[in-house]
């Protein structure tokens, strides 16, 4: 696997779609408001809206609106839940491919995940950049003629945007976009030049042997301190995590009787670390990005599979506290204890996959669409499968009939 190295958001080496990725442009702000996907991966006529209609009184999440635009409300914290293979990871990877397509203007990777290459594949994404503009980017990839290869001529992109006004909501701003005629460039490369202000951070489950998993961010002033707190919480036998000043890119995880020296992600002897402790390293890197305000869009995918529920809840609480204004977090989990956190109902989205003959379709439903009253119990709704997102366990019990 090629490893990415980043300096101020510029990719120096590697491909775009490894399991962790950071694009950092410190002066930018990026918030996703709506996404529609058709004929990519298992997403067919898929839509997820990330605005919410009215202010929540005494919300545990502060400032879920654009600074200076109190009517422009967006879902700052997005907890994605659902059974296995329901699209939680795929959704993040699809977003990352869309972001890279808009940023790098190369279509190869996004074209590689078209589900049916004989049909049109489309996506439409609405997002805010620089706290000033709402963009709508609509992309249609048409199938090539029989015997021909896909080229840039098969790709049609429309970029429209308007400046956000003082009293605008997302809905009023979008209406103005749809009513405003804007000139369209002759090819998708020129059209995408209109898009500015992209920045993001993604983290996915990685193989424990992956070098990038253990690499210390060279430009981080807080990573080692954060890692020290997290690893000592995960493993009481760890007494400290220290940066080795005499060796660039190296740090030591120490117990009273032994140490693990990690240099540039190389891990010669960490077999004694638990899976959960190893996961803590990647989590520390994302929290460092939040604390140092390196990105404003974060996608944290199942980084807590080996970590105790109470630790996961505590770290998620810290992430939410660190988000600050004009930021956005996506967090995928199977841990139903997360439902007990006092978050707005609109923070929870449930994913499910339906199979129709030979085809499958990923769908999502936001808790606030079903639970309208403040007294409605989210935990009870999930336990009673009100969102139709519970895993199918029948086949598991059928094993007993063998």
Predicted regions and their residues:
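Pre-Walker A-like glycine/lysine-rich segment at the N-terminus of P-loop NTPase domains
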Residues: 8, 19-96
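C-terminal lobe/lid and adjacent interdomain/linker elements of RecA-like ASCE P-loop ATPase modules
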Residues: 17-34, 314-402
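Short amphipathic alpha-helical face segments that pack within enzyme cores
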Residues: 90-93, 97, 280-282, 314
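DNA major-groove recognition helices of helix-turn-helix
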Residues: 94-102, 339
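Walker B motif beta-strand of ABC-family P-loop ATPases
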Residues: 297-299
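Walker B catalytic acidic pair
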Residues: 301-303
